[in-house]
Structures are given as C-alpha cells and as structure tokens.
Design a protein with these regions (language model features):
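GNAT-family acyltransferases
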Residues: 1-58, 70-71, 75-84, 88, ...
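Conserved active-site alpha-helix within GNAT-family acetyltransferase domains
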Residues: 66, 88-105
Length: 121
C-alpha cells in the first residue's frame, strides 16, 4: 500500500520489525487454499491508528485483501483508522473504499503521490 519498491527491501523489513515490536500492533496472517497469501495489521503512528495489508503478487485479484480487511475490521475496533496508499496502487485503494474508507487527503511523500484514506465508523 505504502511505497516500498522491491529494491528497498531493508526499509520494508525495518518497517515490519517495528510493527511486530509494537505492543499496540495487531497482526494477522492471511491464509487461503491451504497456504499463506499475505498479511494484515494495524499499529500506532504519531497518534494515529494505521492499517496495512500485503498480498503476494500471485494472489492478486482473488478478493483476499477485501475479505481479510473486512474480517480485520471486526477485530480492530479503533476508529478512526487510517490507510496510506500510493497513487499507482489502484487495487489497494479500491479494497479500502469497498470496506468504507474515504479519501482524507493526498500528499507527495519522497517523490511519490500518496493518498490517506480514513474509516471513521
């Protein structure tokens, strides 16, 4: 969702380690067809609660992200809940919108246009 180009694996792994070390974080593995297809979680960042998900490329377009986010929203009842998605990640933005998130604002982050969507209820 956020901008982690494949060449920036160390930054992504550092981000994941921080989330897993955060006692406020809620994380889940997304399993389908007997295998792991991705992960989803939420955490605190600068006084806001953020949510993010990652689906393996081989599993895109199968509805796993939408199903996982809908189920996750029943687990994490924090509101408002924010999600950051880069402009070119149309699929993730559609998942968020299907689950009730609305655009809060857009801004350039490190030369990438990023949208922040929010779920308030």
């Amino acid at each position: 969702m956020a901008a982690f180009p494949s060449r920036d694996l160390p930054a992504f792994l550092e981000h994941e380690a921080k989330i897993k070390a955060d006692p406020s974080a809620i994380t889940r593995t997304i399993v389908a067809g007997g295998g792991v297809v991705g992960s989803i979680g939420s955490w605190e960042v600068e006084g806001e609660r953020d949510v993010g998900f990652l689906i393996g490329r081989d599993h895109w377009g199968n509805g796993y992200a939408t199903a996982a986010l809908r189920a996750f929203l029943d687990i994490d009842l924090h509101r408002p809940l924010h999600a950051h998605v880069v402009d070119h990640n149309v699929g993730s933005r559609r998942v968020l919108e299907k689950c009730g998130f609305v655009l809060d604002h857009s801004a350039h982050e490190e030369d990438v246009l990023e949208h922040v969507l929010v779920l308030t209820d």
